[in-house]
């Protein structure tokens, strides 16, 4: 099991997944990331406009790596701290991400 999968299952089981998603969503909005990605999508669509067969899946494939690189380090760090805090708070609980 990867660390990502363990964290994902643990946060889902502990009920903290929604809190983490809400935190990430609000921080990405606050820092302007959503607007940057929206502009990136528009730019790609204008560039590919002549290609009528350009699909949503192709757009997502092209945008995803660039969008991930645009996430500010401060947001990544805050999210990591939040996840570590959740693990520390639940350390004594019966939820074991390896058993999930």
From Swiss-Prot:
The keyword Nucleus appears for this protein: yes
Domain of life: Eukaryota
A Gene Ontology molecular function term of the record: chromatin insulator sequence binding
UniProt keyword annotations, A-Z: Activator, Chromatin regulator, Cytoplasm, mRNA transport, Nucleus, Protein transport, Transcription, Transcription regulation, Translocation, Transport
Record-level GO cellular component terms: cytoplasm; DUBm complex; nuclear periphery; nuclear pore; nucleoplasm; SAGA complex; transcription export complex 2
Biological process, per Gene Ontology: heterochromatin boundary formation; mRNA export from nucleus; poly(A)+ mRNA export from nucleus; positive regulation of transcription by RNA polymerase II; protein transport; transcription elongation by RNA polymerase II
Cysteines joined through disulfide linkages: none
InterPro entries reported for this sequence: TF_ENY2 (IPR018783), TF_EnY2_sf (IPR038212)
Subcellular location: Nucleus, Nucleoplasm; Cytoplasm
UniProt KW Transport keyword: yes
Family to which this protein belongs: Belongs to the ENY2 family.
Role this protein plays: Involved in mRNA export coupled transcription activation by association with both the AMEX and the SAGA complexes. The SAGA complex is a multiprotein complex that activates transcription by remodeling chromatin and mediating histone acetylation and deubiquitination. Within the SAGA complex, participates in a subcomplex that specifically deubiquitinates histone H2B. The SAGA complex is recruited to specific gene promoters by activators, where it is required for transcription. Required for nuclear receptor-mediated transactivation.
Subunit structure: Component of the nuclear pore complex (NPC)-associated AMEX complex (anchoring and mRNA export complex), composed of at least e(y)2 and xmas-2. Component of the SAGA transcription coactivator-HAT complexes, at least composed of Ada2b, e(y)2, Pcaf/Gcn5, Taf10 and Nipped-A/Trrap. Within the SAGA complex, e(y)2, Sgf11, and not/nonstop form an additional subcomplex of SAGA called the DUB module (deubiquitination module). Component of the THO complex, composed of at least e(y)2, HPR1, THO2, THOC5, THOC6 and THOC7. Interacts with e(y)1. Interacts with su(Hw) (via zinc fingers).
Protein name: Enhancer of yellow 2 transcription factor
Protein's organism: Drosophila persimilis
Gene name as annotated: e(y)2
């Amino acid at each position: 099991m990867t660390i990502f999968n363990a964290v994902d299952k643990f946060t889902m089981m502990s009920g903290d997944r929604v809190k983490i998603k809400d935190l990430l969503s609000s921080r990405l909005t606050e820092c302007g990331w959503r607007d940057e990605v929206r502009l990136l999508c528009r730019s790609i669509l204008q560039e590919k406009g002549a290609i009528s067969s350009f699909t949503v899946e192709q757009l997502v494939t092209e945008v995803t790596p660039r969008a991930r690189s645009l996430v500010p380090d401060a947001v990544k760090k805050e999210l990591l701290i939040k996840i570590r805090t959740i693990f520390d708070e639940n350390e004594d609980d019966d939820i074991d991400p390896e058993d999930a």
